Amino acid sequence: MAEELSKGYQPGDVETQWYSRWIDAGCFRGDEKGEKPAYSIVIPPPNVTGILHLGHVLNNTIQDVLARRARMEGKDVLWLPGTDHAGIATQSKVEQKLRKEEGKTRRDVGREAFLDKVWEWKEEHGGIIIQQLKRLGCSCDWERERFTMDADYSRWISKVFVDLFNEGLIYRGKRMVNWCPKSLTALSDEEVIMKPQKSKLYTMRYRVAGTKNQWVEIATTRPETLMGDTAVAVNPKDKRYADLVGKMVIRPFPEAEIPVVADDHIDPEFGTGVLKVTPAHDKNDFAIGQKNNLEIIDVFHPDGTLNAFAGPDFEGMDRFEARVKAAEKLEAMGQLVKVEDYENSVGYSERADVPIEPRISMQWFLKYPCVEEAAAAVANDEIHFRPDRWKKTFAHWMEGIQDWCISRQLWWGHQIPVWYRKANAADLQARESLDATSAGDDIYVGIDPPGDADQWVRDEDVLDTWFSSWLWPFATMYKSDEESSPTLKKFYPTTDLVTGPDIIFFWVARMIMAGFRWQGEVPFKNVFFTSIIRDKKGRKMSKQLGNSPDPLDLMAEFGADALRFGLMRIAPTGTDVKFDDDQIVEGRNFANKLWNAARYRQMQEGAVEARPVDFAS
């Protein structure tokens, strides 16, 4: 007689036992040699530093539903898992650990020793989120788990860089980037968090050159950068200042004559309608400077302190201290008109939690390949966006696409595969522009180091994390030196992608371009954009607000199925949802009803004896 089901449903025990049986029976293996129709999906690789949050739960539950449905439909299913090395996120964690335990910085221990520590940390902590995904019940083919720093995957990264460099699409140059003065690296837009902030709006005045008492009032939130001003600007349609355009005004300190220019970017309604132009420290100002051939004066060191160009009164001072000092100096000169409270949004480094600086820096850039093909694939529904309203967002970004800053001043990541001949390395690295045409014999770009490696020095920068993840759908399926593989032939292009709309540019668009460039076709056929989960008050969940429940606690209390059921019930694709524990309680109650129904049937006279399922049959 079959063992009687317990009176109360214990989801933890039942779910764990079933998952182990599925794994032991090989239920999740993708069979590239099978004759059934293929279904494939690649997991958006979570950060190796990560732990499960509700966004992960929703995203991976949707993927699991799609994969399990495909198996029920008789398809060979490959759900390919893996993790991302998460450059700055992982490096930051190890740097914090190093400071706490040894009182040292990464530069104190050196690059090689520091990277050894990162790998040690990764081996110790890197599998946590994978184990959590298994507890959630994800039916991935775990035997195929990949990591973006795997040796084979890393060779793919180098190959792609070499291909694009040789095609003239990768170059090095001086451009304005998001700069973190704490981590001392360029950041992607995705790594910058906009935060509302209570600031001050300073109205100051510059004297018109050649006059004794004609002044121009200028509004700014950043008086600490005025030492880098090389113009002031007005809107060409602003009649108040039409007679000023083309004249010169006098910058207070260091004293210099600078021109008044006209630019459509200037908002006549902001402040006085006149803005200072500091090309080295503002993206819009940089563009104005390029149009008007203005001098670029960088007044900051990389760490956010002021340099010699700021003058002796400010050199070495922190940027925020310099803001106060500059206002005081203007007031002493009689050129500070007023100071008002002002609320604005300021970009913060997501990891370092400090305000970023727009900064002109020597970086590596990529001109995107296959832009037209990618745009057409979405516009013509070769790739279906669900919901399709995201097509407009995608098209708008593709129309205004700009070159991608792919270099980062970090140590953890894929080091750029460029070597400089030692004898000329300093001159080569100081060049303001470098590409395949101008490289010459003193620069080597390759997958492997040059044969006489001791005569060369490697570029110290690493590649943006997204430069590895944009290859994820195909680089996980075969090696870079292979023409193809049975896995690629069977399962590529993948069927579906499930991701958040916040990375439609950073990941989705780039994967489509990479798919066309290296595989000649789209990387997936459908993209499902998930909801953003908010709390009951509609606020985004965060550790700071304390409104983000731990999914592991919820699974321990209610069961994984209850959590999955509750989230799926409230999460229509692409629409923000408000989370409440009551939804998970509903999931638990539903599971209890199913259990009690099975138990009731078991107790009836003449009930069929329950037997273990034979997965092999």
Residues covered by each model-derived region:
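Conserved active-site neighborhood of enzyme catalytic/cofactor-binding cores
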Residues: N47-P81, Q96-L98, C180-K182, E191-A209, ...
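Short conserved beta-strand and strand-loop elements enriched in small hydrophobics
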Residues: Y202-Y206, K247-F253
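Short, contiguous pre-domain boundary segments
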Residues: M1-Q10, A376-R389, G606, A610-V613
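N-terminal, positively charged nucleic-acid-binding surface of large information/translation enzymes
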Residues: M1-K237, V261, T278-K291, E295-A310, ...
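Residues forming anionic-ligand binding surfaces in small-molecule and nucleic-acid pockets
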Residues: H301-P302, Y368-D388, L488-K490
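A glycine-biased structural micro-motif
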Residues: D243-G246, I250, P312-R323, A332
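Short beta-alpha connecting loops at secondary-structure transitions
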Residues: G103-D116, N307-G316, K540, N547-L552, ...
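Short beta-strand-centered aromatic/proline hotspots
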Residues: I258-D264
